[in-house]
Amino acid sequence: MSKIANGNWNETKWQPLRAGIERVVFAMEADTLCCTIGRVENGNEVKPHTHPNEQVALVLEGECDYYVAGVPYRLTAGSWVTVPPNVEHYIHVYDSPVPCLQIDIFTPDRPEYTESFTAFLAEEEGK
């Protein structure tokens, strides 16, 4: 059963994923969804991928092109796009005045994200 939880991503360490991309996983106590906030720098490595999860990508700051099924969607602060399950997609940040800050909501849950982020936090605490 899901637990009630709260927090502030500004008070959490950011997990580096690859050059120019880092994230915080939150709502880890939820049973049926996963939420992340990502910070993506200009010139990020473009990495097309698919997954069985439905996804909503919502931009809070900055700008990006978000490709879904080969179609580019220009996202600015307040913009969002949905990604159906198993559809190729990726983010491309190349001319944003600030790093692109975006929230991703996935359903069903992404336990691999929770496990990876939990391990990252434990490693950081051990330093």
Indicate residue ranges for each PLM-predicted region.
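Double-stranded beta-helix
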Residues: 18, 32-33, 38, 90-127
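Short beta-strand His + acidic residue motifs that chelate non-heme Fe in jelly-roll/DSBH
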Residues: 48, 66-67, 83, 89-96
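Hydrophobic alpha-helical segments of small multi-pass membrane proteins
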Residues: 54, 82-83, 104-108
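A short, N-terminal "cap"/entry segment at the start of jelly-roll beta-barrel domains
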Residues: 1-32, 117-127
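Conserved short histidine dyad/triad with adjacent acidic residue
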Residues: 35-50
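Short acidic-glycine-tyrosine-enriched beta hairpin
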Residues: 70-86
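A generic "binding-loop/recognition-motif" signal
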Residues: 42, 52, 71, 87-88, ...
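Glycine- and acidic-residue-biased ligand/ion/polar-headgroup-sensing regions
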Residues: 53-64, 69
